[in-house]
């Protein structure tokens, strides 16, 4: 049983060095060091820079987390870390550090799939949530529709065949000079804009539940390149329309999967789920 065991978790799959410490179900510490300021000047995450930043930060964050929880390293019962998917160099930093901690105190070492972590995240707010349910996982590198038949039994119904939704936000934001990360930047610029002002495609794929965002990104950049200076299109209208196209595409396949499988409960996970328009429209469907 894990009721009173102290669990130390590491997450370094992309551009955040994160450490959490739990005692059973109680969260004692959740420390996150973001690299957004480091990567902003590049317009996106640079893998080599990210792994170096993890290596520079992880030891300090580890000791700060122990101090915040008023614990000694010997108090830890289980050590866990993300082992993928993600940036290889970043994952290696967290994996090696976590494994060395587990080895030094002779405690169990567990690895966790990044996407399963996203999938289980709704349990933080709703401990009573039980399978079966359908989950929309939307992050910087992944876009997936997953049927959770039971814990440990997951069926991947749909995924992206090219860019993930997060990449679609980031790449267009970089092209337009809106800022990084692209999702929050486009959402902020699009506030007050007309999401129906610009007609952008909602790409379809041969597989009914799969996604494709490269065509949408190309259509948006072509629109800007061919824009007549006399056209009355604001940044807010453009950003809102692009965001709406991504959200509509995400929910179209997800709603179809839910309806065709007959699953009653739904959830969402991943960084892109922080998008307020996506959450709003998903709540309407729910």
Spans of features found by a protein language model:
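Glycine-rich beta-strand-to-loop/alpha-helix junction loops that act as flexible
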Residues: 82-84, 101, 139, 266-275
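DPxDG-like acidic metal-binding loop motif
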Residues: 86-105
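Conserved phosphate-binding catalytic cores of ATP/NTP-utilizing and phosphoryl-transfer enzymes
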Residues: 1-5, 112-134
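A contiguous, well-structured pocket-lining segment that forms one wall/lid of small-molecule binding clefts
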Residues: 72, 188-266, 275-285
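Short glycine-aspartate micro-motif
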Residues: 7-9, 80, 90, 133-137, ...
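A short helix-loop
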Residues: 2-7, 12-13, 20, 29-30, ...
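N-terminal beta-alpha supersecondary unit
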Residues: 2-85, 118
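General beta-strand structural signal in soluble alpha/beta enzymes
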Residues: 81, 109-114, 182, 268
């Amino acid at each position: 049983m894990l009721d009173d065991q102290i669990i130390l978790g590491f997450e370094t799959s992309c551009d955040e060095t994160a450490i959490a410490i739990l005692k059973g179900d109680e969260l004692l510490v959740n420390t996150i060091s973001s690299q957004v300021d480091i990567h902003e000047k590049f317009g996106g995450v640079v893998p080599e820079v990210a792994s170096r930043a993890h290596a520079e930060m992880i030891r300090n964050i580890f000791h700060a987390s122990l101090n915040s929880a008023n614990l000694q390293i010997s108090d830890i019962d289980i050590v866990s870390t993300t082992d993928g998917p993600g940036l290889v160099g970043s994952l290696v930093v967290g994996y090696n550090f976590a494994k060395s901690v587990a080895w030094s105190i002779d405690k169990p070492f567990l690895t966790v799939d990044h996407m399963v972590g996203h999938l289980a995240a709704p349990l933080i707010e709703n401990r009573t949530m039980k399978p079966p349910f359908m989950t929309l996982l939307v992050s910087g590198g992944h876009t997936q529709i997953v049927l959770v038949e039971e814990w440990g039994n997951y069926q991947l119904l749909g995924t992206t065949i090219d860019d993930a939704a997060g990449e679609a936000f980031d790449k267009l934001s970089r092209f337009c000079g809106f800022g990084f990360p692209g999702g929050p930047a486009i959402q902020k610029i699009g506030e007050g804009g007309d999401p129906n002002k610009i007609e952008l495609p909602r790409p379809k794929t041969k597989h009914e539940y799969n996604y494709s965002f490269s065509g949408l990104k190309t259509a948006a950049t072509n629109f800007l390149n061919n824009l007549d200076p006399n056209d009355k299109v604001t940044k807010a209208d453009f950003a809102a329309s692009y965001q709406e196209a991504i959200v509509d595409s995400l929910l179209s396949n997800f709603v179809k999967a839910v309806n065709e499988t007959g699953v009653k409960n739904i959830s969402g996970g991943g960084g892109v789920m922080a998008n307020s328009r996506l959450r709003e429209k998903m709540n309407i469907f729910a």
